[in-house]
Amino acid sequence: ESNQIGDTVKQAIRIRQLYEDFNADYIVLDCRNGGTQILYTLQKVLYDEERGIEYPPLKCMNNDEYAKVCQDPFAKECIFAINATQNINSDIAINFRQNLVENRVDFLVNSEVAKEEILDSNQDYKNAISTDDTTEQVDFEKPFLETQALISECAELQYEKLPQTGAIKVYEHGSNRKDRYTSCSYGAYFLDKLALDLLGSSDDYDYTTLIN
């Protein structure tokens, strides 16, 4: 989702909500601009007033300077911080395109197909419709709507090969944004690095199976 909340604490809480909702293993965080402050906030105890839940700290897994901020020695190391340079962003763009070409990224179906073939068999979703609970109904439909928005966003982006460095620059056209593209491409970049790490440590095992 594209989140324009200015408050870094609220952004951190929203990230924790999604982390819990999807039972995620990792958080990939763009640390440019306000991202570093969000990272520091995620490394502290957070209280979610909306859900009445207290979240324990999480810890940066790939940057010792960031990790030092976390005061909890038992915090789970699961935040992958990216401080993207022009070259890193170029590598991420090339990597993401390759993943798409090789069909290594499976997108959700569009919302209309989801309603007919997936959500129609979900009793909670049908109850939300019958009781006119639009909030819960949207919660079920949102992942599919956000996927459509991601695909549309990517289609509108402009790509330029810089003549001096050969790096690929990705930028918005007009009032369009690239928040969803950044989230998805950074996530794909991290997963590829994780897969390489797993392959690199496979000497201790007879074989390793990787499933995308």
Question: Which residue ranges define each predicted feature?
Answer:
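Acidic two-metal-ion nuclease catalytic site recognized across multiple nuclease folds
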Residues: 178-181, 185-212
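Mg2+-dependent endonuclease catalytic cores in nucleic-acid-processing enzymes, primarily RNase H-like
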Residues: 1-161
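Short, solvent-exposed helix-loop connector elements
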Residues: 163-175
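Generic macromolecular interface patches on structured domains
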Residues: 25, 106, 164, 193-200
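Generic alpha-helix initiation/capping and coil-helix boundary signal
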Residues: 147-148, 176, 180
